[in-house]
Amino acid sequence: PRFFQLRGIGEVEQYQGAPNPSVGFLIDDIDFSGVGMPATLFDTQQIEVLRGPQGTTYGANALAGLISVRTADPGKEFELHAEASVGSYDTRSAGIAIGDGLDAGQGGWRLVAQQYLSDGFRHDAFYDMNTTNGYDEGTLRGKLHWQFNDALQADLTLMHVNINNGYDAWSIYNTYTTYSNQPGRDEQRSNGVALRLVDTIDGLGELRSVTSAADSAIVYSFDGDWGNDAFWLATTGYAPYDYFQSDNRDRRTLAEDLRLTGDPSRALFGRLRWLVGAYALRLTESDNERYAWDAFDAGPGGAAGAGSSTLDSQYGATNVALYGSLEADLGTRTSLSGGLRIERRDANYVDSADAATPFPEQTNDMVGGNLSLTHNAGNGQHLYLTLARGYKGGGFNIGSEILSEQRSFAPESLWSLESGLKHARPEDPLQLQADVFYMRRQHMQVYLSEQLQQNNPLDYVFFTQNAANGENFGLESEGSYRLGPAWQISGSGALLRTRYLGVSGVFTNLGIDGRAQPFAPGYEVSAAIEYHAPGGWFARLDSHALDSFYYYTSDAQTSRSYHLENLRLGNRHGAWTASLWVRNLFDSRYAQQGFYFGLIPPNFPNQSFLQLGDPRQVGLTVNYDLPRERP
């Protein structure tokens, strides 16, 4: 699966049902929050990252922020974009985007198809194969823009994404060689549709309706012992030792966002610009979890030998919200805006293990909003100060080991104070923006895990509890500078500090009070230099550095800081572009994820295990583009 974190807040996994994401994720208005694998990014036009709570316009799924991916829209003229790549580790991809305008200039259409394949950077010694962790990702997308008249227009998006990846990424030796006899799968087949209608109403304003739906079938499975009987017998003298877990999910969403924006030429009282809206989201998810084992020692349920168990569950959540905002000019260059969102979330959960004692339905009434002051300082410089409140709904803890008082957890709220500046003028070689922020988390939801049987790598309990408070604060900046007609440098940087505050109860023994939150690196820095010669030659060298961070709240294991470099060299000639690229130029070894638990028999000592990031990869990409006229 693909998860996101913003300013140190977000998810890193979902092993059970009852999803509850902190980062909203949209692709062409279609909600894929918590299931981000359809972001294959071919023919992408823009990725907008809204950091911090989006309590007015988006609500419960955007406590930490919102990521919105916009793919290329239809144009007025015939257009064609084709791309093919080959690379090391048997990487190859091909994609095509084609579109044209409609008769009488009333709109346009665009069709996209792309396929990406790679072996996944692992070698499974048991099968002597390089594809057990491989990638097989296909995308089909169609977009239609129709201008009915000067006032009414419609945009329709249809998409199908088929992710058929393997999952065999872990080794007890923390290397790229695995020993799994039951390699897992990381699959997602998603269909999505979005219809955006915009109507300009004379004397009132603009009415916008966005209706979207998505259906995702997800398979997530893995070899629970990361080995095979021959390997474990030779390594430890113990066998059989064989565990496997699979989770089949079917998630559906249906959403409607109806918004009326007042005509700015007819502001209320001559100075108030306004917006009102209503939002509804229905999410359902059915899960089938299966565990299988063949163990020399006690497996799930306390019996040695072979066996299996299953857990079927159903989850549903309905969000309904009303929101609005006002903006007023305080002078020729200064404006003040405020927004308010009131949202109700009803959620229910039931599973086959607790059918006799069902989970009580949970209802959360939540309020968010923002107050912002902006000032145009002239010469392309803008300043802002924002106070915002975001929120996230409560949820359920699953499993027979969960105590009755821990079966549910309450909503979390977040106050954010942010100030920043932006300097941008087309004729100016320097483009810059920077901000500082402080976020206070109240009734902070903290995700915990505990291994119940030391001799069983699958016997885990996962649960979320509300800690007292937390804080996240830092500095972010990004910018670019043109050194001349051929050279440009760019970069971004962030400093982040996070802490748990005033924890109690189940968290006391963990010693996390004052400690940093997981997946919250202290710094992140990127820098790039680009060269574009008049003859079509170009080059780009970029570097990305990341500080260490805690993997989980439940233990004190941390990653190591690292940096990666990438290089691209190429030439443009007419409609053709060819580029040679190298990712992870110096073949750095770094960890993407880490676990700390007992896996290796016979004593099963707790120890650290790492999932390594991708090694150096070299490839060639060729593009063909016909000029396009933007609408």
What are these regions (language model features)?
Residues 3-5, 22, 26, 49, ...:
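N-terminal periplasmic accessory domains that precede
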Residues 14-15, 19-53:
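Short acidic/polar hinge/loop motifs at secondary-structure boundaries
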Residues 15, 162-175, 282-286, 346-348, ...:
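Surface-exposed extracellular loop regions of Gram-negative outer-membrane beta-barrel proteins
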Residues 79-81, 86-118, 122, 126-165, ...:
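Transmembrane beta-barrel wall of Gram-negative outer-membrane proteins
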Residues 115, 196-200, 206-224, 376, ...:
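Membrane-embedded beta-barrel scaffold of Gram-negative outer-membrane proteins
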Residues 145-151, 159, 260, 271-273, ...:
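Structural signature of Gram-negative outer-membrane beta-barrels, strongest in the C-terminal barrel
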Residues 261, 275-277, 329-336, 438-440, ...:
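Gram-negative outer-membrane beta-barrel transporters
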Residues 440, 484, 545-552, 571-631:
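C-terminal beta-signal and adjacent terminal beta-strands/loops
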